[in-house]
Amino acid sequence: MLFLDKGRIEALRRRLIEWYRVYGDKDLPWRNTADPWAILVAAFLLRKTTARQVVRVYEEFLRRYPNPKALASAREDEVRELIRPLGIEHQRAKHLIELAKHIEARYGGRIPCSKEKLKELPGVGDYIASEVLLAACGSPEPLLDRNMIRILERVLGVKSAKKRPHTDPKMWSTARRIVPKDPDMAKEFNYGMLDLARKICTARKPLCTECPLNDICIYYNND
């Protein structure tokens, strides 16, 4: 098991949450709901587009299709037209309707709070399953994507031997140890990770002098 400095982890948690409360994108509607269907819809709409683009169609989408049953019986051309501003609307509409039909047929329209069962849904992998568990089921799951991985690598020196670190079970295990156990704090921590990586700890030319983690960051202090 990888050794992680407890003091550094505590500082990482505290500062990320404090930073998120001031600078994070707390107004995003899917961050203010515990409805698993709304969270799944957001996850599918957010693929290959930006949060600000999704905001424009998200609430109208949920107004028309407030549950899996409503979307399962929808016409694909109507769904495509609604989400056209996001791009790849043919693929996106097909996958969303397929997801809704599967939830209706398999679970009677109820979305399970089980990672194994969530991952059986079409188009749902570890990350989206974790999103649902975190936001709808009160489970302190990590949202391990390239953004969180970048911060783990830079701040804590956590490295994966795999070419695709987000598929590395060891990275998932490490991330779970870092996420706070309190469900509300776990959400703030994860969202703080995503926002900090997008705004400050960017892949190229990170704004290290503006980062709340710079004095505990291995990357910054070894640069």
Curated annotation (Swiss-Prot):
Cofactor binding notes: Binds 1 [4Fe-4S] cluster. The cluster has a structural role.
Molecular function in Gene Ontology: 4 iron, 4 sulfur cluster binding; 8-oxo-7,8-dihydroguanine DNA N-glycosylase activity; adenine/guanine mispair binding; G/T mismatch-specific thymine-DNA glycosylase activity; metal ion binding; oxidized purine DNA binding; purine-specific mismatch base pair DNA N-glycosylase activity
Activity regulation summary: Thymine cleavage is completely inhibited by Ni(2+), Co(2+), Zn(2+), Cu(2+) and Mn(2+). Activity is not affected by Mg(2+) and Ca(2+).
Record bears the keyword Amino-acid biosynthesis: no
Alphabetized UniProt keyword annotations: DNA damage, DNA repair, Glycosidase, Hydrolase, Iron, Iron-sulfur, Metal-binding
CDD domains to which the protein is assigned, alphabetical: ENDO3c (cd00056)
SMART domains the record matches: ENDO3c (SM00478), FES (SM00525)
Reaction it catalyzes: Hydrolyzes mismatched double-stranded DNA and polynucleotides, releasing free thymine
EC number: 3.2.2.29
Thermal effects: Optimum temperature is 65-70 degrees Celsius.
InterPro entries cross-referenced by the UniProt entry: DNA_glycosylase, Endonuclease3_FeS-loop_motif, Endouclease-III_FeS-bd_BS, HhH-GPD_domain, HhH_base_excis_C, MIG/MutY
Positions that bind [4Fe-4S] cluster: C201, C208, C211, C217
UniProt note: pH dependence: Optimum pH is 8.5.
Enzyme class: hydrolase
Pfam families associated with the record: EndIII_4Fe-2S, HhH-GPD
Cofactors: [4Fe-4S] cluster
Keyword Iron included in the entry's annotation: yes
GO terms classed as biological process: base-excision repair; mismatch repair
Family recorded in the similarity comment: Belongs to the Nth/MutY family.
Function: DNA glycosylase that excises thymine from T/G mismatches. Also has a weak DNA glycosylase activity on uracil paired with various bases.
Name this polypeptide is given: Thymine-DNA glycosylase
Record organism: Aeropyrum pernix (strain ATCC 700893 / DSM 11879 / JCM 9820 / NBRC 100138 / K1)
